[in-house]
Amino acid sequence: MLSQEAVLSSKLEGTHATLEDLLNYEAGNKVDIERDELHEIINYRKALCYALENITTINDNNSRGLPLSNRIIKEMHKILLNNVRGSSKNPGNFKRTQNYIGSRATIFYTPVPPEQTTEYMSNLEQYMHHDDLDLLVQSAIVHAQFEMIHPFEDGNGRIGRLLIPLFLYYQELLSYPTFYMSSYFESDRSLYISHLSNISKKNNWKDWFKYYLEGVICSAEESTKRHRIS
């Protein structure tokens, strides 16, 4: 299930490798796909495994682990971009140059500038440590805010999607972070981007919450079906 999530999340960023390609590659079989694409997927999986090994949940006072924090997020980013596309774009550190969302011809959103990124990410980190809202709504806010900050020069989408199960695990809504939404986002990528864009353009959180929570239901149903099959 984790490998499938890694494949789907990476597909949103332009990779073409399938789960079958990944499994064949790891079994030592020949595959007709770029090696770097497969390693991007493997790195995604490694980044999540790193987080699982190093974070503790919000009410676990006996663990030596760390809270879900920018320190964890930066290390995940470093692992994600290790020796693959984007490895020259400051892995493990917040952006030093302005980034944009969209194509060169059509920029539809300009994220937070580099000089304000640390401040905004510190605020987001503090927000992740509170539980004053419904946790599913809060996870929708965390994901959207991360994407609007776009703190790294590359790899923001994948890290932002990883934050969803990690946040719910950290807040103890999940006993293990095996809840993934990349399949839902990938099913209509333009709609996903449109809802995120409308938050910044029109402050339209209502439609984002509706879209996101519908995705929670779809993803939960999909996860349940997979567990039954396995």
Q: Where in this protein do the model-derived segments appear?
A:
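FIC/Doc superfamily catalytic core
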Residues: 1-230
